[in-house]
Amino acid sequence: MGTSFFLGNYWLFFSVYLLVFLVGLPLNVMALVVFVGKLRRRPVAVDLLLLNLTISDLLLLLFLPFRMVEAACGMRWLLPFIFCPLSGFLFFTTIYLTSLFLTAVSIERFLSVAYPLWYKTRPRLAQAGLVSVVCWFLASAHCSVVYITEYWGNATYSQGTNGTCYLEFREDQLAILLPVRLEMAVVLFMVPLCITSYCYSRLVWILSRGASRRRRKRIMGLLAATLLIFFVCFGPYNMSHVVGYVSRESPSWRSYVLLLSTLNSCIDPLVFYFSSSKFQADFHQLLGRLLRTCVPWTQQVSLELKVKNGEEPSKECPS
């Protein structure tokens, strides 16, 4: 998190943050409503994992306006300074929370298909809860090292000299941070990527031998969305860890690839959507209710289409 983070076009940062906020927030709020409803009716392990992923995305999105204000002010931090390390900590923690939870989902999906009898005999919900706690701990513990280094090593926030939010590390502090970043890239990105790739490749192979076309399409959509997050959103950022370790300094393009990592909050809902046909049905139902509430004329159009197609109109009262 050196000064290279904020070099470049400030309005590019603002535009990307704003786009992610406007697209990601409503989608993740809707996903939260759907998952809470599903867990109340019939708790399933994969839904608990995806609920945690949704909460992680919402934490990032709720603190994203702080970054938007910062970018709009030319990367000057004019807000209470306590929000600087807090927003930064959540910003980086959610990156690795996503990779860990996506990996947990891939394992859950693979086990349910490859070993269905064994899978049904296991207390999956309790295990999913334990896995969720471990994921939160691993991501938080790794990302907290940056801030421990800051206070322990008397690093100075650059706010003290130029009003920005980013840390300026000395050479001895970089000697600690750069290996930690490399370890994060290996343990929290590369290993999860390998596990996820293995699970989904085996899953696709198993389903190709007898599953319905609809189920295969859903799994392929889930695979595509997951790999898009790993390779496009998180791959370049974690590559900067490797480059930084080799060159002994943060690369100048690190700030731009970090922007890509925020896009996962918009792509994660695709993972939710392809996670199950039940989620798709609940999502469509919730979206229909919102449209009827916000745009009343859509209900009349729906009734007219049903009458035109010879269908029986619903007897429900307008919501």
UniProtKB/Swiss-Prot annotation:
<dbReference type="GO" id="GO:0090276">
    <property type="term" value="P:regulation of peptide hormone secretion"/>
</dbReference>
<dbReference type="InterPro" id="IPR017452">
    <property type="entry name" value="GPCR_Rhodpsn_7TM"/>
</dbReference>
<feature type="topological domain" description="Extracellular">
    <location>
        <begin position="240"/>
        <end position="254"/>
    </location>
</feature>
<dbReference type="GO" id="GO:0002879">
    <property type="term" value="P:positive regulation of acute inflammatory response to non-antigenic stimulus"/>
</dbReference>
<comment type="function">
    <text>G protein-coupled receptor that is activated by a major product of dietary fiber digestion, the short chain fatty acids (SCFAs), and that plays a role in the regulation of whole-body energy homeostasis and in intestinal immunity. In omnivorous mammals, the short chain fatty acids acetate, propionate and butyrate are produced primarily by the gut microbiome that metabolizes dietary fibers. SCFAs serve as a source of energy but also act as signaling molecules. That G protein-coupled receptor is probably coupled to the pertussis toxin-sensitive, G(i/o)-alpha family of G proteins.</text>
</comment>
<feature type="transmembrane region" description="Helical; Name=6">
    <location>
        <begin position="219"/>
        <end position="239"/>
    </location>
</feature>
<dbReference type="GO" id="GO:0002385">
    <property type="term" value="P:mucosal immune response"/>
</dbReference>
<feature type="transmembrane region" description="Helical; Name=2">
    <location>
        <begin position="44"/>
        <end position="64"/>
    </location>
</feature>
<keyword id="KW-0325">Glycoprotein</keyword>
<dbReference type="Pfam" id="PF00001">
    <property type="entry name" value="7tm_1"/>
</dbReference>
<feature type="glycosylation site" description="N-linked (GlcNAc...) asparagine">
    <location>
        <position position="162"/>
    </location>
</feature>
<keyword id="KW-0391">Immunity</keyword>
<dbReference type="InterPro" id="IPR000276">
    <property type="entry name" value="GPCR_Rhodpsn"/>
</dbReference>
<dbReference type="GO" id="GO:0042593">
    <property type="term" value="P:glucose homeostasis"/>
</dbReference>
<feature type="topological domain" description="Extracellular">
    <location>
        <begin position="1"/>
        <end position="15"/>
    </location>
</feature>
<dbReference type="GO" id="GO:0016020">
    <property type="term" value="C:membrane"/>
</dbReference>
<feature type="glycosylation site" description="N-linked (GlcNAc...) asparagine">
    <location>
        <position position="154"/>
    </location>
</feature>
<dbReference type="GO" id="GO:0032722">
    <property type="term" value="P:positive regulation of chemokine production"/>
</dbReference>
<feature type="transmembrane region" description="Helical; Name=5">
    <location>
        <begin position="184"/>
        <end position="206"/>
    </location>
</feature>
<dbReference type="GO" id="GO:0071398">
    <property type="term" value="P:cellular response to fatty acid"/>
</dbReference>
<keyword id="KW-0446">Lipid-binding</keyword>
<feature type="transmembrane region" description="Helical; Name=7">
    <location>
        <begin position="255"/>
        <end position="275"/>
    </location>
</feature>
<dbReference type="GO" id="GO:0003062">
    <property type="term" value="P:regulation of heart rate by chemical signal"/>
</dbReference>
<keyword id="KW-0395">Inflammatory response</keyword>
<comment type="similarity">
    <text>Belongs to the G-protein coupled receptor 1 family.</text>
</comment>
<feature type="disulfide bond">
    <location>
        <begin position="84"/>
        <end position="165"/>
    </location>
</feature>
<dbReference type="GO" id="GO:0002720">
    <property type="term" value="P:positive regulation of cytokine production involved in immune response"/>
</dbReference>
<feature type="transmembrane region" description="Helical; Name=4">
    <location>
        <begin position="128"/>
        <end position="148"/>
    </location>
</feature>
<dbReference type="GO" id="GO:0014061">
    <property type="term" value="P:regulation of norepinephrine secretion"/>
</dbReference>
<keyword id="KW-1133">Transmembrane helix</keyword>
<dbReference type="GO" id="GO:0007193">
    <property type="term" value="P:adenylate cyclase-inhibiting G protein-coupled receptor signaling pathway"/>
</dbReference>
<feature type="topological domain" description="Cytoplasmic">
    <location>
        <begin position="207"/>
        <end position="218"/>
    </location>
</feature>
<dbReference type="GO" id="GO:0005886">
    <property type="term" value="C:plasma membrane"/>
</dbReference>
<feature type="transmembrane region" description="Helical; Name=1">
    <location>
        <begin position="16"/>
        <end position="36"/>
    </location>
</feature>
<keyword id="KW-1015">Disulfide bond</keyword>
<dbReference type="GO" id="GO:0008289">
    <property type="term" value="F:lipid binding"/>
</dbReference>
<keyword id="KW-1003">Cell membrane</keyword>
<keyword id="KW-0297">G-protein coupled receptor</keyword>
<feature type="topological domain" description="Extracellular">
    <location>
        <begin position="149"/>
        <end position="183"/>
    </location>
</feature>
<keyword id="KW-0472">Membrane</keyword>
<keyword id="KW-0812">Transmembrane</keyword>
<dbReference type="GO" id="GO:0046676">
    <property type="term" value="P:negative regulation of insulin secretion"/>
</dbReference>
